[in-house]
A protein has these predicted regions:
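Alpha-helical transmembrane segments and their membrane-interface boundaries
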Residues: 1-122, 126-176
């Protein structure tokens, strides 16, 4: 099966530039605001997590971006809850990670949110792997990853909506 390259439209270029601007904005915000809130420099994992969250919600339409943002937040909230309870009781380790992923997968399935299982599992793995590096502050990891996710989702959706609105307002086409 041969794949035919698509022609790029002006919107495709705007979309690409908007995504690049979005990643720059969330990077700068994360590295600037995190030290003000935590009194420590932003950690690479936090910066990366915020950028990933912003990129994840950057979709072809505003509605798809909002839907992706809600999925990202739901998966992160389930992971946050399970990881926080676990880390308050036990040290982070691979066995605990596997158990939490199994429990969370079952909870997401029962809630009818199978599409978010992958997001939940990735988030849980990141939280527990990073928590294992520094056991004294392991319980903080769920809070930090939740904050990074909220920041990334907010910036990603906001930038997508602004660019989409402005482009289609100026071009006279219906907003996507």
């Amino acid at each position: 099966m041969q794949v035919q390259p698509e022609k790029l439209s002006i919107w495709d270029v705007v979309h690409a530039v908007d995504l690049a601007i979005t990643t720059f904005i969330i990077y700068v915000l994360t590295t600037s605001i995190t030290p003000l809130l935590t009194h420590h420099p932003a950690q690479p994992v936090g910066i990366l997590w915020a950028v990933i969250s912003a990129v994840f919600v950057f979709r072809d339409t505003r509605e798809h971006s909002l839907s992706a943002g809600m999925s990202r937040l739901l998966a992160t909230c389930v992971s946050f809850t399970l990881c926080l309870v676990y880390l308050l009781l036990f040290p982070a380790n691979p066995f605990g990670m596997a158990i939490l992923i199994a429990i969370g997968t079952l909870l997401m399935t029962l809630a009818g949110r199978r599409d978010e299982i992958g997001l939940f599992a990735i988030t849980t793995a990141v939280v527990l792997i990073v928590a294992a590096e520094n056991p004294q502050t392991a319980w903080q990891q769920p809070f930090l990853r939740l904050a990074d996710t909220v920041a990334g989702v907010t910036v990603g959706i906001t930038c997508k909506w602004i660019a989409s609105f402005l482009f289609f307002r100026l071009s006279g086409q219906e907003a996507r």
